[in-house]
Amino acid sequence: MVRNLIYFCYLKNSEIGEFSAYHLFLLHRYFHIFNGVRIVKIAVDDIKIDNSHLKELFKDCSVEIVQNHPLHRESEYFIQSIREIKNNNSITFFAHNKGGSNIYADDAHKLWVLSLYFFNLEPQYVEKVEKGLSRNKVFSGILRKTVSCPPWVPNN
C-alpha cells in the first residue's frame, strides 16, 4: 500500500529547539516507510526573513515555508495538504511537532511523542493500521499527560 506523509513543523523564531529536534530525529528514523507523497509545511513566525535553509531538514519532500498562525496552527494547512493526495489506495500519516513552541521537552510529552511515532510507524503497527483502515475504522491519537490511549476508534 502507498503510504503518504503530511507533516506540519512549527519552528519558533525559525530555530530548532530540543523538542523539535526530538520530533525530527524520530520522523527521520521512519522516513523510509513513506513511499508516496511527502508534504511538509514549515511554519515560522517571520515569513519575510530567509528561512530557505530549513527546507534541508526534509530532503525528498515537497516543502513549503508558511506563516505560523497561533490560533489555527497545524489545522490551517491540513485541508490544503490532504487535497494534494490523489491516490485513493493509500494511507496518510499526519503529524506535527507537538510542543514545538516549547524550548525544552518535558518527560510526559517526550513519552507521548515517542509513542506516537513508535505505535504508528513500526512495521508491525503499520500493518495493523492498514488492515484497520480497510475495515472502515478511524485511526487517531490524543495527548494525555501520563496515560496511553488506544490508537483505534470504531467509526460508530
Regions inferred by a protein language model and the residue ranges of each:
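ER/Golgi luminal nucleotide-sugar-dependent glycosyltransferases, focusing on the catalytic module
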Residues: 1-156
